[in-house]
Amino acid sequence: MARVGRVGFLTLAVVFHLMYAYSIFDIYFVSPIVSGMRSFGVEREASAEAPAKRLVLFVADGLRADKAFQALPDPDAPSDLENDEPIYLAPFIRSRALSHGTFGISHTRVPTESRPGHVALIAGLYEDVSAVTTGWKLNPVDFDSVFNRSRHTWSWGSPDILPMFKEGAVPGRIDADTYGEEAEDFSADATKLDIWVFDKVKELFASAKKDPELDAKLREDKLVFFLHLLGLDTTGHAYRPYSKEYLRNIKLVDKGVQEITQLVEDFYGDGKTSFVFTADHGMSDWGSHGDGHPDNTRTPLVVWGSGVASPRYTHEGTITGHEDGVSADWGLDSVQRNDVAQADVAALMAYLVGLDFPTNSVGQLPLGYLDTSPKDKALAALANAQGVLEMYRVKEEQKRDALLRYTPFEPLADNGETSVEARLERIKTLISNKSYDASIQLSSELLLTALEGLRYLQTYDWLFLRTIVSLGYLGWIAYALTTVIDLHVLHGKSESNRTTFSIMFFSSILVALFSVLLYQGSSWRYYLYALFPIFFWEEVFARRKALLAGREILLGHVHSVSGYFAFAIQLLLYVGVLEALVQSYFHRDIFTVCFILGGFWPITYGTKFLGQHKLLSASWALGCFLMSIFTLLPANKVEDMMMISCGSLLMFLTGLLYLIFERSILGQKRSSDPNSVVSSCGSRTIMGAQVGMILLALIVTRSSVASLQAKQGLPLGNQVLGWAILVSSLLLPFLHRLYPNSHYLHRLMVIFLTFSPIFIILTISYEGLFYFVFCMTLLAWVRLEQAIYIHTTAPTREQDHSVANGSLPAKKPSPGNTVVVEGQPYRYRTLSVSDARVALFFFFLLQSGFFSTGNIASVSSFSLDSVYRLIPIFNPFAQGALLILKLLIPFAIISANLGILNHRLEVAPSALFMVVMSISDVMTLNFFYMVRDEGSWLEIGTTISHFCIASFLCTFVAVLEFLSELFISGVDFGHPATTVGSAVAKAVNGSVACGHSPDSDISGEDSTSVGITAKADPDARS
């Protein structure tokens, strides 16, 4: 096929990585939802009633198990009270656990978000991990649930949760009464949300006394009442779960639950109501959730009322459920703790109210919560197992029909006495013989085996898909390296060399794969997964001569064994850095070690180099030392106005000092040209406005923080002004086009000032300090790289030594390497092995731009405190966009610096970016095999996050390539025909204009950027 150019390569990189980033969800997290199953319920005699006629479900959104049961300081106690003894904040719920019902911990799965949590509670189903985003908009639950099985369900609460169950159920079966989205204000008192729910329930029963039709409807059986209490989640996000506001909200919820319980009991008076109190997820100490931290996965479960077992008091030497020590300080050691998986709650509710188990439920009925006869327990356990077996049967039929060859799950295969039918008959026989305990044991074993079978079917295609994806990533690495060599080492002079055999070979593999996928009815994504590795490896094979020619150019200088050994050591070192970056995803302090070592990097170029560039080397070392500190600081931060102010003042002073000493910094003399004077004044005025915007952003942020911390809400004026600053700071730089200053330092300062106000508004702690240090370090890096480039291209003994040891320095542009830019010849030099080190530095700094202020065990590491200053109302897409904007700012800064570095190292604009994209998937492939879908939920969430971020960062490099061109558009690097390569010419030929030393544009003024240029010898040889 035709050779891909720069745009084609970058586009292919984006498409490939976006597709393959999704591959983990097709491999590890396929939706477990299937349809076509019959439902199963407990077989009762015609005259027998269900344990309860109705069920009331309380879900305290975001309530941690420990906060529900621990003794904690009274949030309403006077501050001057001497005897501030801890109290139990939920005495009524606690009394249900101690005297009236059964309690335990409900263990949730990741992602610990509201939609997956409610789906598990109400449908008994764990949605695939990617379903978390569907909770941010109306996306009906299109599978069976307890609500859908009920005769009627009344629900009250959040507009984010209730509609998805109502819209996905049988029409008219669910009533959903919600407050408006504007009520979810993080800056307001969130307890009003729970009060609203309790009041609405009271209104319903009050209306029934006046409405006979409603009264009759309420007295039917198989009814469910669902109270979604969002106050704790909203309060926890805003104030943290250890705050007085959160603790006060627990007291309010407990009081409300008590009132509703009493109201229902008084209304019916028949004692046939079951009550379930639980939470969809917990909350970390930082007010976040989403990952698998135990604070997020442990939620309270208290069940009482009709059909529920009374507390089982523990005795010494017996199993109490408290052995793990989690509940040691809850004061509940006297009663047994019965832990469940979150999906088990759906099975429990269905049993209590006499419903069939939801057809997609994988929950195991917790028999310890039931107050019923052994026979009923045995029948319930059997029905529970039959429901899960039915789901396995349907999924197996679908898998068998789709595959060319299917290998059944051995424990559930049709093998005579061990067949499913034989086991079910044995269980029924045991029940008939009143051997209830034995039948329950067999039912439990059969259910667990069915779950293992579902797991087997879920992972059936793993080997096939993982092999294809692995070959795809390896193929991309090989293809990208081949393309880099073809475009930037051989300059497109190599030709493809396809043979008839190779065409037939790769085509046959592709046809075979597509045929299998077509027969199996696979998703369209599978075809792309298969297409990419075939395409990449075919291209690599076709351009194998380019690889050989590139090897001659890049390593042709290496002839001795010691040279090859030195090159091998260098290669291993690069791979070691990439593997260190992999580990840095788990241990941020690896960045600290790397930065400290990197600070000494200039020493490797000898004492002469250090002597010529003392200030520059010191600046780089200082930047590295300061950067090493940030990854030692906690990733989870609390709001610190002092840190915000310090970072803001550093940004302000940087801009102010630049305005004062601009001419000295740029090495420009005062001009007498009227047009130049006007342009200079205009540019300085605009930059002055940018500097002033920083100060204004600090003032507004301090005011907003003070108001929010005082619980006075976000003033409208602050919100409007905050948005005005954010938008205007992004628009102001465009005014510089009216009064252009093309010096690269000026351009970098404009970009720095552009993002400073945004960073101030969206920072909560030390991020502003990081932004300042990061920009300073990048500038030192750009100037240091150019100094090294000039140093290593000079024909010195140091250069000869580096060649002998296998490290070929960069060469200055040769006359043949010419492209046309704006109608003029522009020469780029050939890439060398040493440029891989520059690309690796860029990739390291790119990663540090993300990790220095956070980690990615989960996205929830990033606090929402800052976005409350702009959007106090719950709006996940808008708030998420602001957080992403904050995360992307360092990437924008580094793209501008690399764009300038490309020019100053005289390489093609896309060259270094392409090298980065060639090597970065070494990390991505590591994380692909680290992804887990079982084990601790913290590990699962972490591995997903790691793979996705690594893959998206690689994709983002392609975007940065285009962004860098935008940022440096119009920057003056001198006349293309004369100044490209002038720095090298000065070092090689010694012909320096205006009396500057060869390094003057590095350590002092930048001569090539302000028109003080040297004549490059057009015939100079590399």
UniProtKB/Swiss-Prot annotation:
One GO term describing the cellular component: endoplasmic reticulum membrane
Matches recorded under InterPro entries: Alkaline_phosphatase_core_sf (IPR017850), GPI_EtnP_transferase_1 (IPR007070), GPI_EtnP_transferase_1_C (IPR017852), Phosphodiest/P_Trfase (IPR002591), PIGN_N (IPR037671)
Carbohydrate-modified residues: 148, 433, 805, 989
Topology, Lumenal side: 28-466, 520-560, 611-614, 662-685, 735-749, 792-837, 902-910, 969-1022
Entry's Gene Ontology BP terms: cell wall organization; GPI anchor biosynthetic process
Family that this chain belongs to: Belongs to the PIGG/PIGN/PIGO family. PIGN subfamily.
Stored CDD domains: GPI_EPT_1 (cd16020)
Keywords in alphabetical order: Cell wall biogenesis/degradation, Endoplasmic reticulum, Glycoprotein, GPI-anchor biosynthesis, Membrane, Transferase, Transmembrane, Transmembrane helix
Species this protein is from: Aspergillus oryzae (strain ATCC 42149 / RIB 40)
GO terms, molecular function: mannose-ethanolamine phosphotransferase activity
Ribosomal protein found in the keyword field: no
Broad class of enzyme this protein falls into: transferase
Highest taxon in the source lineage: Eukaryota
Protein name from the UniProt record: GPI ethanolamine phosphate transferase 1
Region named Disordered: 998-1022
Gene name of the encoded protein: mcd4
Subcellular location: Endoplasmic reticulum membrane
Spans through the membrane: 7-27, 467-487, 499-519, 561-581, 590-610, 615-635, 641-661, 686-706, 714-734, 750-770, 771-791, 838-858, 881-901, 911-931, 948-968
Record pathway: Glycolipid biosynthesis; glycosylphosphatidylinositol-anchor biosynthesis
Residue intervals annotated with topology Cytoplasmic: 1-6, 488-498, 582-589, 636-640, 707-713, 859-880, 932-947
Role description: Ethanolamine phosphate transferase involved in glycosylphosphatidylinositol-anchor biosynthesis. Transfers ethanolamine phosphate to the first alpha-1,4-linked mannose of the glycosylphosphatidylinositol precursor of GPI-anchor.
Pfam families xref list: Phosphodiest (PF01663), PigN (PF04987)
Enzyme Commission number(s) from the entry: 2.-.-.-
Topological relation to the membrane, as annotated: Multi-pass membrane protein
